[in-house]
A protein has these predicted regions:
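Aromatic "clamp/platform" in nucleotide-sugar-dependent glycosyltransferases that forms part
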Residues: 329
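Carbohydrate-associated surface elements
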Residues: 180, 201
Length: 440
């Protein structure tokens, strides 16, 4: 089975006839609900891989109910299998004068037109619950026709039980992102035999090792610069306040060493997160650092300053950075951290969610939370347990890697080998197909 330069268009989709869904003579209709595959966020990346794989199966007819297809944010370099039949939720709603972002008001019509054998929802519990509410009548009428599957994105342990139970009553099967989340679903009352694990895989076609010195030169860095990377988007859950405090504490300890630099790939001001400029300025004031020097000599970002970058740019950035940092309060999977680590770059990360599964065997620094809060309704409607780490612990991990290049190399090698062996799309997609066969 040969690999394809277009990712999973051919390399991981062909030669799997023994794992195809159902009987080879029957076309199985699948409606896949997810973020549009051209979007730069994790939902888009994973949706792209899954849909290309399914569309390449000889007995699958794939419909893609694509949400969040925002113009001006697409990665035009991504391969999209031409067999996929798209329903663009934003375009469909715009045509009827609706401001709905998730296609909830058109999902019943689409389901009745397609009558899929399997309906896969790849989203969080709020969007999933809204869709299921809109489909209660359909499910009652066509319960023997369509199997409902929730590929559920949980980010905090013990999210709102009312939503979990509602989804449990109205789907035939769950896919969890990792062992951590499968256990949490079971702890919340979902039957163990109703939950499978569908990991995110590492895309070895899109992300490949480039010599560090070449990547650093591309961004104008010196070979001996110590580049710290945070690619998380700017939302409260990603806790960029902790990242900024940890980075500035490292600068303070190292007397503003000119080699220490932070590259961030997200919006610098976000209503759902922080104004990064304000964070830096106030923390510099606390620590006695010169804000202008920090901003102009130690903090870097892409010129657009909004966090939208093509996969090729991200690949170059992963290779330029020496370590990654992720200070989140909860994590569904941690795709950016996993991808960066898979290129041999150790991470300093919160020990939360799926990150505890990915990095449990070493090769990086897992920072243990110091406090737990229940998420308030006004912060996030799905609630759950929010885990907070001490920024000093992240500063300790970053400082250790700054002073120990051999440790960086050893840890980078170890975590890369672990990820390549564990999060291999070949294996993951075959297991996914086996689980889908059980559902029919």
């Amino acid at each position: 089975m040969s690999d394809s330069v277009n990712g999973y268009a051919n390399g991981y989709a062909n030669g799997l006839s023994e794992n195809e869904i159902g009987e080879s003579t029957k076309k199985i209709k699948i409606l896949f609900y997810a973020t549009h595959p051209s979007q730069p966020i994790g939902y888009g990346k994973i949706g792209n891989t899954i849909s290309n794989f399914l569309a390449a199966q000889s007995n699958v007819e794939l419909y893609y109910f694509a949400i969040s297809n925002f113009p001006g944010q697409t990665d035009e370099t991504r391969y999209i299998n031409p067999n996929i039949k798209f329903i663009d939720a934003l375009a469909e709603d715009a045509a009827i004068g609706s401001s709905e972002l998730y296609g909830v008001d058109i999902i019943d019509r689409v389901m009745r037109e397609i009558k899929p054998d399997i309906f896969i929802i790849y989203n969080d519990i709020i969007v999933t619950s809204r869709l299921l509410n809109a489909l209660l009548q359909y499910r009652q009428e066509f319960k023997d026709v369509t199997r409902f599957v929730s590929y559920v994105d949980l980010v905090y342990p013990f999210e709102k039980l009312r939503y979990i139970r509602h989804i449990d009553r109205n789907v035939d099967y769950f896919f969890a992102f990792s062992d951590f989340w499968k256990k949490n679903l079971i702890d919340m009352g979902v039957r163990a035999d109703k939950v499978g694990i569908f990991y995110h895989g590492f895309d070895k076609h899109k992300f490949q090792i480039i010599p560090s010195e070449v990547a650093k030169e591309h961004f104008g860095f010196s070979t001996d610069d110590f580049i710290i990377l945070n690619t998380n988007r700017n939302t409260y859950r990603k806790a960029h306040d902790i990242s900024m405090k940890a980075f500035l504490e490292l600068l303070r300890r190292e007397r503003m060493d000119s080699r220490i630099k932070l590259f961030i790939n997200h919006q610098m001001d976000s209503l759902s997160g922080y104004n990064i400029y304000d964070l830096l300025e106030v923390e510099c004031l606390k620590l006695g650092l010169v804000y202008e020097d920090v901003l102009n000599k130690h903090v870097f970002m892409f010129k657009n300053k909004v966090g939208h970058a093509e996969d090729s740019q991200i690949n170059m950035l992963y290779n330029a950075a020496d370590v990654g940092v992720n200070t989140c309060l909860g994590e569904g999977f941690g795709l950016c951290s996993m991808e960066h680590a898979a290129l041999g770059k150790p991470q300093v990360i919160s020990s939360v969610g799926a990150l505890t599964d990915i990095f449990k065997n070493g090769g990086s620094v897992l920072v243990k939370p110091k406090a737990v809060l229940s998420v308030a309704n006004h912060v996030d409607e799905h609630n759950g347990d929010l885990h907070i780490c001490d920024y000093n612990d992240f500063a300790d991990g970053l400082q250790m890697y700054f002073h120990n290049s051999s440790k960086r190399k050893v840890d980078g090698y170890d975590i890369r080998e672990h990820i390549l062996n564990t999060y291999n799309w070949n294996t993951i997609l075959v297991e996914f197909m086996k689980d889908l066969k059980k559902i029919l």
